[in-house]
Amino acid sequence: VVCGDIIGDIDRRPPLFEPVSEALAASGVAFFYVAGNHDMDLGVRTSDRAKRSFKEHFGPTYYAFDRGRVHYVVLDDCFYIGRSYLYVGYLDERQLRWLEQDLATVPAGRTVVVCLHIPTWSRAARSGEWSREESHKVLNNRRALYRMLEPYNAHILSAHEHYNENYTPEPHLFEHVHAPLSTLFWQAPWSMDGIPAGYGVYEFDGDGLTWYYKAADHPRSRQFTAYGVGEDRRRPDAVTVNVWNWDPAWQVVWYENGEPRGPMTRYTGYDLSLIHI
């Protein structure tokens, strides 16, 4: 699943949709596409018209399908407001009605995976600073979506931000935010969180779902960046570790010479890889 921003701004590089779709098709892997803000036609009068080029190359901007016991839904939450490059995170009434009808066919308790571009929640909301939410970085009418997903074991796959993040906005919901393969707009091999360019891998067994992060230039077993004592001048006496795609449910324990030394203390800071660019 490509969670949007398939290319750079379409108005500046209009030929790219076709070669990108051809290259992905040549891989022999089935790809499903989500519309992102960089995939919109600009300068048009409505959000519907902003998705014309996307639809010509990839089909509808919202749709659903089943694979095994899992129901997948792709939504379009990039709402173009008809001026310049401006857009907001929003699901219109037509799309919400369609989603109601689609979910009416899905038994309660089933695993549902929702793919969209703009994340449903924000760091500002999670810290209680609602007034700091930016309308183009969050799904503004997320509560409507959350209510529809209440009967299910739901996972939301989103993108838009240039970092990886995991959180549970509601007890029945788990959202996975994915950084782009372009990381910092191709200017560095790391995203804003100091994690190497890569992608999320999701494995299903019946209704069950597990996941891990796969850095493009590293084996699956590589899941963190570690800095020894003295490398981080802000914490000169500490071993510092950036755990890739960290999950709030995890406890990180450090070992020395094969012996456990106890849980590590979590803090918010800067990865040394980015500081030294």
Pin down the residues of each PLM region.
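Active-site beta-strand/loop signature of hydrolases that rely on acidic residues for catalysis
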Residues: V1-D9, G36, T111
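Short acidic, glycine-rich surface-loop motifs adjacent to enzyme active sites
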Residues: C3, V106-A125
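Active-site glycine-centered loops adjacent to acidic/histidine catalytic or metal-binding residues
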Residues: G4-D5, G36-N37, H117, A159-H160
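Extended active-site neighborhood of metal-dependent phosphoesterases/phosphodiesterases
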Residues: D11-A108, S127-H155, Y163-D205, L209-Y212, ...
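Short, compositionally biased P/S/T/A/G/V-rich stretches that sit at domain boundaries
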Residues: D205-D237
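Short edge beta-strand/loop segments characteristic of extracellular beta-sandwich folds
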Residues: A238-W244
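Short proline/glycine-enriched turn/loop motifs at strand-loop junctions of beta-rich domains
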Residues: N245-A249
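Conserved small/polar residues in nucleotide/adenosyl-binding loops
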Residues: I275-I277
